[in-house]
From Swiss-Prot:
SUPFAM superfamilies: Cation efflux protein transmembrane domain-like (SSF161111). PANTHER family: PROTON-COUPLED ZINC ANTIPORTER SLC30A5, PTHR45755. Residues 538-584 are annotated as: His-rich loop. It is found in: Golgi apparatus, Golgi stack membrane; Cytoplasmic vesicle, COPII-coated vesicle membrane; Cytoplasmic vesicle, Secretory vesicle membrane; Golgi apparatus, trans-Golgi network membrane. This is Proton-coupled zinc antiporter SLC30A5. It comes from Danio rerio. The chain crosses the membrane at residues 29-49, 53-73, 95-115, 117-137, 149-169, 190-210, 233-253, 264-284, 300-320, 339-359, 415-435, 445-465, 480-500, 517-537, 603-623, 628-648.
């Protein structure tokens, strides 16, 4: 069979997107790199020119220069069909909106500087649309897209909060006299109304302009098709924009004083900006999108632009760079504002990662119908639909659904309320510590923040236990609460150990302690933790009956969903096996071994904090009244010992569950149940009984039963399921074995010793036809 018609097309990777050879793509990637480098240089040059040229005049020159070149080369009037009047009105609207977006972008450039403008405004439409779809739709593209959206938001936050821009220099350059037109005055007034600095207002303005630009480009696609192509629309729109701006420029030239000493010195800078920013970038990006994938073009373009922007920002004020751009200087001294900072570097890294993720194509697997097999035995599928993978929810919807699930159940609701209270106290403590410059308050606030991580772990575990079972996690996620309790217990043991070691060290050499703020902080922490103890003590004392219900008065009846076994006969062997008896919701109360380990771990964390607050209050009183500095390490020793001793039972119970130990509180009932099973009519013996606790509310078990050849299997399954259900097992699997089963196992070439053991066990039990067994 010819290779192209073989069944190995899928495995050989020959089915899918047809890609050009890498050597042919390299030239376009190199071209895109140099284009983005020139565009970054043009943006930096634009920032310098905007210091002396009014923003409206600057935009008019760019639009007019771009229109002249495009009309000459593109010939939008002679090529293509004639444009009717209705289309000219649409072009006029397109040009006006384009001018507004460009004005916002260039004004943001004057506020934030060239590098930050590149990072905020120069993103592909694909990236922004992917970001918005993650945030506001249910088809965001999976966890990777959500991660990319998070990186993008973090990058913007870094520019807002951690970018230490030279605000003092900006304030010195921004007196009221700088408002040389109504437009700039209105924009500055709007930013001042927000109550933020010009730099932060510029960040917000550029983000808004970016969203408007993407929406504008998306809406313009239909118009470009009607006009006769995007290039023709671009040429006509720039020409109309220049015509619209011309009266405004004439009025500004007549009413304002120009800061330009010589317009002839700006000819080359303007020509370079028009060529690199307005023309070259548009045409090269169109070519690369046609030759490369749109996602690859967007990803490479953003990375190249950001990296060149970082490079230029580092060397723009260097003397060598000044010599290179000496022909375009305007007589102004180079400014030192908008320099590189740690915040902008971190932001650039996050922007690069976000654009790389958000511009990547959504890889969706496909579900198909099995239509047959190839001669080699390879399955053949008919692909009809979308991916097997589930679409991820949008972030607001995910938060809303999670909060709804948290507030539905008692345990998670209690943890959530206490977490909110704890976080509120933590941030108040941190704020007051920063306000008063108290290192003790700040350190205690971060300690409380660490404690909140244990509550978050417990809350997440309580939420996961209600997730539905999947094909991979067929038992569900009930055991997550055990893992949460185990991890919280380990955290507490580590904390207790380090507190104990530090206390022993301080016993030898007690340090001086500043007790000024200890008492109010400890009293506040004690009040918060007492609320937590009251909230979690019920769960701590009631155990699994609390962990498996939603409220205090909810219980499970004995309706017991039973699934009878299916009898499988194989080729005349008469082999029957496997009984599944799932019965949910027994009415037995459990002792501490079956209690909710997750809630126990949370309770012990709160108890440890409470003991710590009590210890601090006692030691503070003793130090203030009697000067006993040794009281602090003694209280710490006592508290760490209590924490350690209280955690041991939790770790012991969690380890027993994780090691699949038979539940201790059910051990006697299970042994008695096995004796009753031995006496059921038709049961010869049993082997391999396994019983373990899966979670606080689920006890699982498996057992093999040897039966007489003429017994009714369903009756035996029903009786055995009832016996083990009374013993507390609510997830049961039964395998029935008759004489034909051993013959079948021998035919399948099972292990000799296994078959021999089972055969000897069967032969040792002789029984009459009436069912009387003789051992």
């Amino acid at each position: 069979m010819d290779e192209k018609y073989s069944s190995n097309v899928i495995s050989s990777g020959k089915l899918g997107r047809v890609e050009a050879p890498n050597a042919r793509l390299t030239r376009y990637i190199v071209l895109l790199y140099f284009t983005k480098m020139l565009k970054a240089f043009g943006i930096f040059e634009s920032y310098d020119i905007l210091k002396v040229v009014h923003i409206v005049q600057f935009l008019f020159i760019l639009k007019m220069g771009c229109a002249v070149i495009l009309v000459f080369f593109q010939k939008p009037f002679s090529s293509g069909k004639m444009i009717p009047k209705r289309q000219w009105i649409k072009i006029l609207k397109h040009a006006v909106i384009s001018c507004i977006i460009s004005l916002l972008g260039f004004f943001g450039l004057t506020l934030c500087g060239p590098l930050r403008s590149l990072l905020l405004f120069e993103h592909s439409d694909l990236v922004v649309i992917s970001l918005l779809s993650v945030l506001f739709t249910s088809s965001g593209g999976g966890p990777s897209k959500t991660r990319g959206a998070a990186f993008f938001i973090i990058a913007v936050i870094c520019l807002l909060l951690f970018d230490n821009d030279d605000l003092m220099a900006k304030m010195a350059e921004h007196p009221e006299g700088h408002h040389d037109s109504a437009l700039t005055h209105a924009l500055y007034t709007g930013i001042a109304f927000l109550g933020v600095a010009d730099h932060k207002g510029g960040v917000v303005l550029l983000v808004l302009a970016l969203c408007l630009k993407v929406a504008f480009n998306t809406a313009s696609r239909k118009l470009s098709v009607e006009i006769g192509g995007a290039k023709r629309l671009y040429a006509l729109s720039n020409l109309v924009s220049a015509v619209v701006l011309l009266p405004w420029v004439i009025v500004l030239s007549a009413t304002t004083e120009s800061k330009v000493e010589s317009w002839s010195g700006l000819i080359f800078p303007f020509a370079m900006i028009i060529f690199s920013v307005m023309i070259l970038d548009f045409y090269v990006e169109s070519i690369c999108m046609a030759k490369l994938e749109t996602s690859r073009c967007a990803r490479y373009g953003a990375i190249f632009l950001f990296l060149n922007g970082l490079l230029l920002a580092n060397f723009w004020t260097h003397p060598l760079t000044g010599q290179i751009r000496a022909i375009s200087t305007t007589g102004q001294q180079s400014s030192t504002e908008h320099v590189l900072s740690g915040g902008v570097l971190v932001s650039a890294c996050f922007f690069i990662m976000a654009d790389s993720i958000l511009s990547a194509p959504s890889s969706k697997g496909q579900k198909g119908t099995l239509v047959g097999y190839s001669p080699e035995g390879t399955p053949l599928y008919n692909f009809m639909g979308d991916a097997l993978q589930h679409t991820s929810q949008s972030l607001p919807r995910f938060i809303k659904d999670s909060l709804k699930q948290i507030l539905e159940e008692y345990d998670s609701r209690q943890i959530f309320y206490f977490l909110c209270l704890n976080l509120a106290f933590t941030f108040v403590e941190l704020f007051y510590g920063v306000w008063t410059n108290s290192l003790g308050l700040i350190s205690d606030g971060f300690h409380m923040l660490f404690d909140c991580s244990a509550l978050v772990l417990g809350l997440f575990a309580a939420l996961m236990t209600r997730w539905k079972a999947t094909r991979i996690y067929s038992y569900g996620y009930g055991r997550v609460e055990i893992l949460s309790g185990f991890i919280n217990g380990l955290f507490l043991m580590v904390i207790a150990f380090f507190v104990f070691v530090e206390s022993v060290t301080r016993l030898v050499d007690p340090p001086n302690i500043n007790t000024d703020m200890l008492t109010p902080v400890s009293v506040g922490g004690l009040i918060v933790n007492l609320v937590g103890i009251c909230a979690f003590s019920h769960a701590h004392s009631h155990g699994a009956s609390k962990g498996s219900c939603s409220g205090h008065d909810h219980g499970h009846s004995h309706h017991g969903h039973g699934h009878s076994s299916m009898e499988h006969s194989h080729g005349g062997h008469g082999h029957s096996h496997g009984g599944h008896g799932h019965s949910h919701g027994h009415g037995h109360s459990h002792s501490s071994g079956g209690m909710n380990a997750n809630m126990r771990g949370v309770f012990l964390h709160v108890l440890a904090d409470t003991l710590g607050s009590v210890g601090v209050i006692i030691s503070t009183i003793l130090i203030r009244q009697f000067g006993w500095l040794i009281a602090d390490p003694i209280c710490s020793l006592f508290i760490s010992t209590l924490i350690f001793l209280s955690v041991i039972p939790l770790l012991k119970d969690a380890c027993e569950v994780l090691l699949l130990r038979m539940p201790p509180q059910h051990e006697k009932e299970l042994n008695f149940a096995l004796e009753k099973i031995q006496k059921i009519e038709g049961v010869l013996s049993y082997r391999d009984p396994h019983f373990w606790r899966h979670s606080a509310s689920v006890i699982a078990g498996t057992i093999h039963l040897q039966l007489m050849s003429d017994v009714v299997e369903q009756r035996v399954i029903q009786q055995v399921s009832a016996v083990l259900k009374d013993a507390g097992v609510n997830n049961l699997t039964i395998q029935l074995e008759k004489e034909a089963y051993f013959q079948h196992m021998s035919g399948l070439s099972s292990g000799f010793h296994e078959v021999l053991t089972m055969t000897q066990q069967m032969e040792s039990m002789k029984y009459y036809k009436d069912g009387t067994c003789i051992m």
